From Swiss-Prot:
GO BP annotations, alphabetical order: carbon fixation by 3-hydroxypropionate cycle
Sample GO molecular function, one term: succinyl-CoA:(R)-citramalate CoA-transferase activity
Record organism: Chloroflexus aurantiacus (strain ATCC 29366 / DSM 635 / J-10-fl)
Reactions catalysed according to its record: (3R)-citramalate + succinyl-CoA = (3R)-citramalyl-CoA + succinate; (R)-malate + succinyl-CoA = (R)-malyl-CoA + succinate
Family of the protein in this entry: Belongs to the CoA-transferase III family.
Induction: Under autotrophic growth conditions.
Domain of life: Bacteria
Upper taxonomic lineage: Bacteria, Bacillati, Chloroflexota, Chloroflexia, Chloroflexales
EC number: 2.8.3.20
Active site per the UniProt annotation: D174
Name used for this protein in its record: Succinyl-CoA--D-citramalate CoA-transferase
Top EC class, one word: transferase
Subunit field text: Homodimer.
Keywords: Transferase
Keyword Transferase: yes
Length: 402
């Protein structure tokens, strides 16, 4: 922990991150945000592929890595070599958690499976994120986030009914699995305080998606209903949609409760809508959803998004324009709550990124540094933690183990 910052709740937790891409490393980011010392293991010479992922470059660097690897320490180990595997085994007694997202069985092939590592550290918590989990007939299949999204149910219900299933604009499957993995890690850590024993946290990417599918399963089981794509509406819940504006943007209005709809009707200058039999109750509005949406859209087209926001705020109607990064960086509420912060990067200068979520009143998380250079912390970890000598490091480097 840096002596120049306040303490964080996970300052006494050390994590060895063996994963790559997103599903494992985002879990590591969440833990590091709250103070965990996350030691990220990367292949020598090339590092995590996420170092090269991203839509745009600035000063020759992609911009995903500085966010995903923030607060982490980078060391290099070739896990495919006996010497590299031996280094991991030497590190395991010094850590609380091992985080990995290889295909099931890979670490076992390298002699780094649960049985081997647990024997070295009985209190170890091993966080295992994979496409389909560590058990079951699909455990050995390759499974990226897109496959988990498809099989977990979210692709089938995303988009419009007359078009093919649509991808959400972010890697939601990987991120959900990572978030649940972080939750599982903290639950296991709490249990270890009681028992002194570690355990495996096992999540398949598809399960992280499935967990958010609301009542989709019992709806089919008990009624035979299969949810379909519905575009931007909530079926039978109205009004809740996006509406066009006079300045060519889109505006979200959610006024599906009776009292809120009454206020919306007043804001529209059409208070009679609240007593119209077609719209007077939640059920009636649901039955006349398209008709109601058309009425609201015809009204919103007369105003800019800013004008609509003023009116909706005045009448207490939940509403807002659809933001891009441009609006987020200038919004006074984002600024007041420091939802986006600036972090110094030695190569990029100040880089803006999302702040730590959630907020803790007494021991909040924070961001101390952006994603590190490849192997930046080799000497710190290998010499200070493991006691290797300069000769040891030179030999391992010569063999390309680190």
């Amino acid at each position: 922990m840096s002596s120049q910052r306040p303490p964080r709740p996970l300052d006494d937790v050390r994590v060895l991150e063996l994963g790559a891409f997103l599903a494992g490393p985002f879990c590591g980011q969440l833990l590091a945000d709250f103070g965990a010392e996350v030691i990220k293991v990367e292949p020598p010479g090339k590092g995590d592929p996420m170092r090269e992922w991203g839509r745009h470059r600035y000063k020759g660097r992609t911009l995903w890595w500085p966010v995903l690897a923030r607060n982490k320490k980078s060391i290099t180990i070739d896990l495919r070599t006996p010497e590299g595997q031996a280094l991991v085994k030497r590190l395991v007694p010094h850590v609380d958690m091992v985080l990995e997202n290889f295909r099931p069985g890979t670490l076992e092939e390298w002699g780094l499976g649960w049985e081997e590592l647990h024997a070295l550290n009985p209190g170890l918590i091993m966080i295992r994120v994979s496409g389909f989990g560590q058990t079951g007939p699909y455990r050995d299949k390759a499974g990226f986030g897109s496959i988990g999204e498809a099989m977990g149910g979210i692709r089938a219900i995303t988009g419009f009914p007359d078009r093919p299933p649509t991808r959400i604009g972010i890697s939601i499957g990987d991120s959900l699995a990572a978030t649940f993995a972080a939750l599982g890690a903290l639950v296991a850590l709490h249990q270890r305080q009681r028992s002194g024993q570690g355990q495996v946290v096992d999540i398949g990417i598809y399960e992280g998606v499935l967990a958010l599918m609301e009542s989709m399963i019992p709806e089919y089981q008990l009624t035979g209903h299969i949810r379909e794509r519905t575009g931007n509406i909530l079926p039978n819940v109205a009004p809740s949609n996006i509406y066009p504006t006079a300045d060519g943007s889109w505006f979200v209005i959610g006024a599906n409760a009776d009292t809120i709809f009454t206020r919306l009707a007043q804001a529209m200058g059409q208070p009679e809508l609240a007593t119209d039999p077609r719209f007077a109750t939640h059920q009636a509005r649901g039955e006349h959803q398209a008709e109601l949406d058309d009425l609201i859209a015809a009204w919103t087209l007369n105003y800019t998004a800013d004008q609509l926001q003023v009116m909706m705020d005045e009448y207490g109607v939940p509403a807002g324009r659809i933001y891009t990064a441009k609006e987020m960086l200038s919004d006074p509420h984002f600024i007041a709550r420091q939802s986006i912060i600036g972090v110094h990067d030695p190569d990029l200068g100040e880089i803006k990124m999302q702040n730590v979520v959630p907020r803790l009143s007494a021991t909040p998380g924070g961001v101390d540094w952006t994603g590190p250079a490849l192997g930046q912390h080799n000497r710190e970890i290998f010499t200070d933690l493991l006691g290797l000598t300069e000769d040891d490091l030179a030999m391992l480097q010569a063999k390309r183990v680190i």
